[in-house]
Amino acid sequence: MREIDRMDPHNGAIRFLEFPEGDIACMVTSGGAALTALGQLMVLGGRPANAFDITAGPHEEKMYLATRAILERPGLRGLIAGGNVKNFTRVDLQVRGIVRALREAGIDARRFPVVLRFAGPGLEAARDIAASLPDLEFYEDDTSLEGAVRRIVERTREGASP
């Protein structure tokens, strides 16, 4: 992750921490939102595999590379990504990077659940990009971040069928 961050240290700084016992990849950003999501995930019985945050900026490539790096971890059972309403970051760029990495990794969202919850500039394009990957669940600001966390926990418990 450090190498990815060094690519352009002035554009979307990454903070990352792994949890050895976790099995749900977390790419929830926005500082406090990320911590809230991790706490909610644990309250609901999920096990976060990591903590992740990236500062505001146009960072499609960093999201792509970070998603690829996170997906390399063995034993993952699902992925949640998103954040609070973004005022500075185009969410379509974030979603494009994530979906590109998922597609290249050959992720089948029926077997490996993916839940995204984004809101902010570029939302319509983000929705279209997310819809291009079958069975990826995409939520907007009418769904709370806690609701999206609940959904990834449910999906990983269900054995990933939507």
Report each predicted region and the residues it spans.
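A short helix->loop->beta-strand "cap" motif at the edges of active sites that frequently abuts
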Residues: 109-112
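ATP-dependent carboxylate/acyl-activation modules
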Residues: 1-78, 103-104, 119-121, 126-162
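Short, glycine-/small-residue-enriched flexible loop/hinge segments at domain edges that mediate gating
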Residues: 73-89
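Charged helix-capping and loop-helix junction motifs
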Residues: 94-100
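Short beta-strand elements of ligand-binding domains
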Residues: 114-118
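Residues at alpha-helix caps and immediate loop-helix transition turns in enzyme cores, especially N-
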Residues: 90-94, 126
